[in-house]
Amino acid sequence: IAEALRTKYSIAHNHTGANLFSGIAAALGANPNAEVAVLEVDELVLPWAIEKTKPELVVLLNLGRDQLDRLSEVRIVSNKWRDALGGQRVLASTDDPFVVYAANNAAEQIWFSASEKGHMDAATCPQCGQLLNWEDDGANFWCQCGFKKPNANWVLNGETLNNEFKVNSSIPGAAAKQNAARAFIVANEFGVDLEAANQAIGNVKAVDGRFAEKIIGQTNFRLLLSKNPASWRETLATSKLGPKKVLLVVNANTQDGKDTSWLWDVDFTPLSGREVLVTGERKIDVSARLTVEGIDHKVVADERIAANIFGASDADIIASYTAFHRLANK
């Protein structure tokens, strides 16, 4: 979004991913005369950020289970968002019942669909608590109380928006394509030349170190960040199309979430048939999970040992938050 809008405006942006109070304040303070501020905001910080910045547009991504010891359940976060969005203009996903419930309270909605199916936490209606009805193989949802999936203003099919605009994305994975599409829609809302915006979006090769390359020993690693079951599902699907060798690095610090029970919500079967190494502060937890899944793997002390084992080859590192940023800044 920042790069798309930068083609027309001067931008203040927390480009390092520092999305809590201090990071937002630092981004605004670093460029106080910017014409537009593009701020990535933590789930719990969103109500505060809306109150303090009075945004012209709030872009809501999907809302999944993440750091339950810090964020609480998805429904609680959705309710907090709903309370904060009164009077706001939002770009929101129609595919996520919790986002729809929150965005329904906004003054104006721009609905976006990537035709995603189902939601691992949405068995019941966020509005009334009754069982949510899922139809069309998970593509649509509705409830007897009247809550339902809204019609989308923008629909992404593959790389094409509304069967008209092909969106550029140089970052692999379905989530990256969806974010590129959202950036395109935001550029349209802010009156940016769409051809210039689309080119700028396509020029983004890595975001805050994600998908950046890091050479350790003789191994060329690609860095992938995964923080919760939803992001692990997406990352594992993306990684499956890449190198056969993969290193998993999982910590459990405050920024990661100290509760690692989420590992049991992740389907690790995409790792089958690959050379898998495991390290990090919670490597034993990960090893236990992979053993139950039947995934062959080895536990190693750190990424240097992993590089010695992998040798001169390409490999992926899939890392939790603190491990990822340590490696990205190494």
Regions found by a protein language model. Give the residues of each.
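Buried hydrophobic packing segments
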Residues: 5, 24-28, 180-190, 235
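Generic beta-sheet signal
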Residues: 60-61, 93, 112-114, 249, ...
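Short glycine-/acidic-enriched loop or helix-start segments at secondary-structure transitions
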Residues: 23, 48-49, 69-70, 100-103, ...
